[in-house]
Amino acid sequence: METVSLVPLEGLDDLSAQSAAIKKIEQNFSNIDSLASVTNHKISLIQQKKTIEAQIKNEVHSELEKSKKGLETLYKSYNRINRMDESFSDTVELCSETSNLIGHYQLIKKVNTVRVNLINILKEVDRLLTIPEKAAEIEQLLSDDLNLLEIHSKLRELERLHQKALKQFESNFEELEAIKEMFSSVPELSHRFENKIWNIVSNSIDIAQIKPAVLVKVAQIIEREKLHEQKQKEKKSQNSLISSEGIHDDDDDDDDTEVNLNNSNKQQNNENENSSSNNNNNYDINNEDEGYDRNRSNYGDRFLEVLIQSISGKFEPMFLNSHNDLVQTLKDVNKMVDELFIVMDIVQECYPPSYDLFNFYVDQYHTKFYSLFGSFSNLMESSHVNNNYQVVVTKNIPSAHILMLVEWVVKNYSRDLSRLGIQDISPPLLDSLDPLIKIYKMHIKQLMREWCDNIINNDNQNKPEVVDGQYCSLAPIQLFESVASQLDIAAATKCQKLVVGVMEEVVSALMYFQVQSITLLQERNHEIKLENVIAYVNNNSKCYDHTQTIVDKVSNILDSEHMGYLDFDPVLEGFLNVSKVATQAISSVIFRDLDECIHKFYTVEWYQEDLMQPIINTFEDYVTNDIQKYILENYLKRLALLLLDTLIEQLLAQLIGGKNKFNENTYKILSNDCDKLLDFFKKYLRLSVVTAKVQILEDFKQMITSSIDMVPVYFRSVINFHKDINERVVELVLYQRTDISKSEITEVLGQIKTIVETVHTDPTNPPTGIFSRMNIYQRGWFS
């Protein structure tokens, strides 16, 4: 495309401006139709141009006016400088002309200096003579705390006079001693005044309730002193900076000039001091002598130190007496908490907000509370540790006191903190009571274990009652009444940590109760009457229900986090286990009566008389007369199943380990025994269950009486349900048969071994069961 050259625009010499204008034109007239609006655009641009020209004209006029005024000011200044030069020259000339007109000028000059010095000395003497009067006035003002500001102003004035006098006469020992004697009352007054200030600060809470205005005045005095300290630091910093830059006074000034300068400074200081005396309540920190140092500690730091000492002094008696009278200590602690409300409502209002006194008091009091309770807790713990057993003995501190402390912290203190507007404070005060909670837990542990032992002993000595047709004792009621009592006591404190601790010991005690019960049932069941053993079954089943109730109750008391610390599952399983062991104990009682009869099985006597019937009769007698009416139905079924399993296991042990040979009557007698077992146990168990249990006797009957070829078949039937059987069992049985040879036995045992290897694929994890419990690996079993 051909490039079209642009015609330069009139009035636009700058190329960038021309380019911008051309782009604007291209933008507004990009097509032919837009040319119709050329006139409108032209009018608009002309109007904009006029507006811009008017603005520029105004700005130029304004700048010209400013420049004109500046030139006028510069011209006037130049004229004044010229006149000053002329006047100075005239003055020098006049001074030179008149210096010789006055006779004895130098002498007159010295006399005048002496006169000025004498006047100043007389003024100083007059001021010094008023010191006793001012000291007496301050002494009188000290009797009323409301005069603190006035006392502070007057006392600081005396201190400044004292300091200046010491400076002026420091080269004359006699005069210096006289000055010290004259001002002897000033240091004492200062000391008394400061002690008064800090005594008021120490007793801020008490004074705030009587004369809060006094605290306001003390705060003003402290602020004055802090401001003075700040100014002194700034001056020292400036002086250090000047010294570092090498700036110093001219050492060549003559003596007369130095005296005059000193006198001038004295006059200026005297004027300032008079001004201060006339306006005591408007204290000007700037009238302090630059070189004056009162050698006092930082007022801000001293203020905090006094408060901390005051608070420590209040707590010291409680630290000393808490272990002797905890109740009184807790009353004192309540008073201290009440003081925090006074601080919030009155004391903090008397001091500047920057002091943040309320939070300071809260932090200090909370720290002291934590230390107080912590030291008391540690003292109680250390004084009750038995080094032989490492247990805490709780005779010297009543558990009621521990509960009282915990309840106060959780209820009262937390409520008061909330009223004070404090939502969270660290460390939690309850943490300081951890040693006491530990002591209380040990108390619960000992108490619960004593109760458990007593309950078990009494339970075995007394005959159980029949409740709803079942044997029951008071053991569950007594046990869980004690548990509920301890839970209620702990819950009353509203302390979840204590509830968790108590329930941990309760869980431990319940498991201890279970262990003791199991030990008794397993090792001494022969000493316990049958009805008591039956009561154990029923009781522990009820204990399971009671435990569930306790779990529900605890879950309503604790939040989910604290509830997570407790595990009741072992307790629930433990009570079921006790009932199981009690059921086994009933079985042991019954089988003690059957022991002699069972040992006759598969002997000569077994062939001569019916031994199964006496066993069935014994079962019938126990179950019908002594057990069925007094035991829970589900445990009756478990007992029946246990009796059947135990009997079958003992019969198999007799069968496998028998030393008598089988004969032609073996099959018939075994069949009769199996039928009698089925007939009896089907009354208490499902027929399918009894049949499955008795099937193993049927299979052994077939292995004893069938042909040698069928033995592996019946062995397979047995191993399907009893994986722990092996070829050794079959070997012991087959060697009691008289109708087969050893070679046949050897051959069939090979087949049996193959079956066993097929089933037992993991030699490191052998199966367990009836046969694994039998001692069948001793060769003495062979006849």
Swiss-Prot record:
Ranges of compositional bias, category Low complexity: 260-285
The UniProt record lists the keyword Transport: yes
Biased composition (Basic and acidic residues): 228-237
Summary of the function given for this chain in its UniProt record: Component of the exocyst complex involved in the docking of exocytic vesicles with fusion sites on the plasma membrane.
Pfam families per record: Sec6 (PF06046)
GO biological process: exocyst localization; exocytosis; protein transport
Biased composition (Acidic residues): 248-258
Signal peptide span: none
Subunit structure, as described in the record: The exocyst complex is composed of sec3/exoc1, sec5/exoc2, sec6/exoc3, sec8/exoc4, sec10/exoc5, sec15/exoc6, exo70/exoc7 and exo84/exoc8.
Segments of this protein annotated with the region Disordered: 228-294
Coiled coil regions in record: 147-184, 259-281
Positions of disulphide bridges: none
Transferase among keywords: no
Upper taxonomic lineage: Eukaryota, Amoebozoa, Evosea, Eumycetozoa, Dictyostelia
Cellular compartment(s): Cytoplasm; Cytoplasm, Perinuclear region; Cell projection, Growth cone; Cell projection, Neuron projection
The protein, known as: Exocyst complex component 3
A GO term from the CC aspect: midbody
Superkingdom of origin: Eukaryota
Family affiliation: Belongs to the SEC6 family.
GO molecular function list: SNARE binding
